[in-house]
Amino acid sequence: MAEEQQNSDQSNGGNVIPTPEEVATFLHKTVEEGGWEKCWEEEITPWDQGRATPLIVHLVDTSSLPLGRALVPGCGGGHDVVAMASPERFVVGLDISESALAKANETYGSSPKAEYFSFVKEDVFTWRPTELFDLIFDYVFFCAIEPEMRPAWAKSMYELLKPDGELITLMYPITDHVGGPPYKVDVSTFEEVLVPIGFKAVSVEENPHAIPTRKGKEKLGRWKKIN
């Protein structure tokens, strides 16, 4: 059973999940030529684990996430959106790719949790919802945007959160590779854009629930909006 679980953790649809370096080399040309929509249209999505992020499953199972309204920017196939959704937590999955959201709706449209989540086609940098969020979860979104867009990302996170809201960042990939996406990150990469605008790091720790190919390359950061 342990071997089966490890194989599951390392795979996506039967394919081994590649390293950040391999993904960066593979994706650069595709994104440059056709953007993220082309990636989803042609099913070139090596970052998609095909299931909810193990850390999110753990946080849900241990009741370690804020309740209320939650947002997952760059939600892709929607796995984490559905995992987080509950009667006490309504989750919005945001993406600019119609194909990604079509896949998410196809996979989860008939889920028994369907009334507790929605998928929305919007750009997180310009979207202004009528209600703000108690929680935002970012994983493989921050590392996918161009590095010069990171201050704008931080501003959007701040503006979309309620006062005293929480931002959870699963920081990845913490490597020394060149280029992207995904672009390399570290804790200071997040601190530099979040702290000056009014976020405080509550905790930063290794992710013990990372899949084998990402062990040692991820950290969990929990941030509170303080002003």
From Swiss-Prot:
Pfam families, from UniProt? TPMT
**List of residues binding S-adenosyl-L-methionine:** W36, W40, W47, G74, D95, D123, V124, Y139
Catalytic function, reaction form? thiocyanate + S-adenosyl-L-methionine = methyl thiocyanate + S-adenosyl-L-homocysteine
What would be an example GO MF term here?
thiocyanate methyltransferase activity
UniProt-listed SUPFAM superfamilies: S-adenosyl-L-methionine-dependent methyltransferases
Q: Which residues cross the membrane?
A: none
- What are the Phosphoserine sites (modified residues) in this protein? S86
Q: Which GO terms describe its cellular component?
A: cytosol; plasma membrane
Give its E.C. classification number.
Answer: 2.1.1.n4
Q: What is the recorded name of this protein?
A: Thiocyanate methyltransferase 1
The record lists the organism as Arabidopsis thaliana (Mouse-ear cress)
